[in-house]
Amino acid sequence: MMNEKHLQSLLICRLGGAALSEEAARELMEAWLAGEVPAALSGALLVAIAPLAITAGELAAMAKTLQEAAGAAPTGLPVLLDTCGTGGDGLGTFNISTAVAFVAAACGVPVAKHGARSASSRVGSADVLEHLGVHLSQERARVRAALDAVGITFLFAPGWHPALKAVAPVRRELGIRTVFNLLGPLVNPLVPTAQVLGVYHPSLVAPMAEALERLGRERFLVVHGGGGLDECSLTGPTALAGNLSGPICGSRLHPEELGLAAAPLEALAGGDVAENADILRRVLQGKGSRAQSEVVILNTAAALVAAGAAAGWMAGVTLARDCLADGAPWAKCEALIRFGNT
C-alpha cells in the first residue's frame, strides 16, 4: 500500500516539472485502482500529470498496470486491429473511427474495437453502437467469440476495467482531460497487434507513438489531422508517426495526393446519438455524403496500412472505396448486432 507521504512526494515531483519513473507511475496506478488515493490528492495528481506534458514512459507503465488489472487476453491471431483513439477534439464530428472499424473488418482484417460512452465528444462509440442494437454488456467469452464468428468485436471499456470506478468521481468533478483519456487507446485487453490511433493535440503524436512501441504494438500509426481532428483529415495535412518501416518516424499526409477532395470540418458534423447512428448506417451502406465517405476511406486506408493489409496508401484507398461501395461494412455491423442478440 502506498502511503500518503509517498503520494505527496510524487505530486511534488510532478509539480516541479520532473517525470515520474516507470516504477513510480506503476505504483501510482496500482494505488488508484485499489482506491488508496484520497480524493483531494487524487485530483491534484491528475492535474499535475497533465496530458500534454506526459512522457511515453509514464504512459506505458500506467497502461501495462491497467491492462494487467483487466486480465489481458491476447488472441493469438497474427493480425488484430484496433481503431480506438483518444477522442476529445471537441469538434462534434460523427463517429469516424467506429465506421472505420467496420470497413476494415469488411476488408478482411480482424478488428477488436475498444471504446466507451461519450466523455468529451457528443456521442461515444459505445453510445452509437448501442443505439444501433449492439449488445455492450456481454460476457468476455462472448466478446471473444464474436471476433471469430463475425470478424469484429466491441470491448466496452467499463466492463473490462471495473477498477477505474475508484477514480471516476474525481475525474467527473475535475471535468478536464486527464491521463486516463490517453490510456483508453493503449489498454485493449485483447492486445491488438496493429492500431491506428488518433490524438486530439499534435504534441501527443510522439509520446503516444513511443508508448505503443514500449507496449509491443507490432505495427501502428498515430495521427492528428488538419483542423484539430483526432483522425486523418480532409481539411488539411495529417501529422503521422508510425513504425511501419522500422523505427518510429514522422511524416505528413495530404489527402489530395490520394485523390480525395478537401472538405471543411462542418461537412463531417454529427449530432445527437440518433443522428450519429443514422450517419453511421448510411456511410456503411455506401450512401454517405462525399465528405463523410471519403474521410472514412482515408482513415480506413490508414488502418489497412497499419494492419499490413494494404501495400500502400493508394492501395488502401482503393480497397476501402470498393468495400464501402458495395455495402459490405453495414452487413458486418448487422452481423455483430445479430450475434449479440442470439
From Swiss-Prot:
Its EC number is 2.4.2.18. InterPro entries: Anthranilate_Pribosyl_Tfrase, Glycosyl_Trfase_fam3, Glycosyl_Trfase_fam3_N_dom, Glycosyl_Trfase_fam3_N_dom_sf, Nuc_phospho_transferase. It catalyses: N-(5-phospho-beta-D-ribosyl)anthranilate + diphosphate = 5-phospho-alpha-D-ribose 1-diphosphate + anthranilate. Mg(2+) 1 binds at S97, E231. Pathway: Amino-acid biosynthesis; L-tryptophan biosynthesis; L-tryptophan from chorismate: step 2/5. Keywords: Amino-acid biosynthesis, Aromatic amino acid biosynthesis, Glycosyltransferase, Magnesium, Metal-binding, Transferase, Tryptophan biosynthesis. Anthranilate 1 binds at G85. One of its GO terms (cellular component) is cytosol. GO terms for biological process: L-tryptophan biosynthetic process. Its cofactor is Mg(2+). Belongs to the anthranilate phosphoribosyltransferase family. This is Anthranilate phosphoribosyltransferase. The gene is trpD.
